[in-house]
Amino acid sequence: MKVNLKPLSVNQCWQGKRFKTPKYKKYEKEILLLLPNSYKVPPGELKIALKFGFSSKLSDWDNPIKPFQDILQKKYDFNDSRIFKAIVEKEIVKKGEEYIEFEITKI
């Protein structure tokens, strides 16, 4: 099925300036420390594969994509507009065993 309408960006969905919450700032700091410095993002158009391990069945599969992607962009100095394809998976895990897996490859 195809809908002939320009997609709305997250930025276009909200009015006014948005600020990072203290919880997001803490999350960003923790992720930046956990991500390996040696990871290299290839040049050109990219594909990202993400797998989120949630402990709640109610977690939406798409909610963590943009915050995590923005952190990857910051850590590895690339523009996420280069991502042309994404594969996203959700897995339910025990509380305390939550995780994020990712891989960025050239198309």
Question: Model regions: which residues?
Answer:
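Acidic, proline/glycine-enriched N-terminal capping motif
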Residues: 1-107
